[in-house]
A protein has these predicted regions:
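N-terminal alpha/beta PP-like core and its mobile active-site loop of ThDP/TPP-dependent enzymes
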Residues: 2-130
Length: 130
């Protein structure tokens, strides 16, 4: 077996691509792709890994709350056998996903939210939302 070096983000995308659910003996890919708004906090990690994995579709969203509602609606249509990963930038982008997450939780709809983050040791200039 050959070792394959991956970043954490690349390994995460590989892991998500290989998740399956089984019902009545039929296996389905669990994640149909990723919906997201790339910004500070997720471009360098998840954004780059998604760009390198063209077989895991990425769809640009325009609103974080709508993105989560879209993923939940897709999961409902697919009878909870398939859903989307949702990613956003840090700060308000991440908090805008909370309403959609609450609605999905109440309705027992699977969605995976991956908000952006920054390195704890990173020394950056004082920029809004960091």
């Amino acid at each position: 077996m050959k070792t394959k070096r991956l970043t954490v983000a690349q390994a995460t995308i590989e892991y998500l691509k290989n998740q399956y659910v089984e019902r009545d003996g039929v296996q389905n890919k669990f994640f149909a792709g990723c919906l997201g708004i790339l910004g500070h906090g997720n471009v360098a990690g998840i954004g780059q890994a998604l760009h390198q994995n063209l077989d895991f579709p990425f769809y640009v969203a325009r609103n974080e709350q709508g993105m989560v509602h879209t993923a939940a609606a897709f999961a409902r249509v697919k009878n909870r056998l398939q859903t989307f990963v949702c990613t956003s930038s840090i700060g308000p982008g991440a908090t805008n996903m909370i309403t959609g997450a609450a609605a999905a939780t109440i309705n027992r709809i699977p969605v995976l939210l991956i908000p952006g983050d920054i390195f704890a040791t990173r020394q950056v200039a004082p920029v809004l939302q960091q």
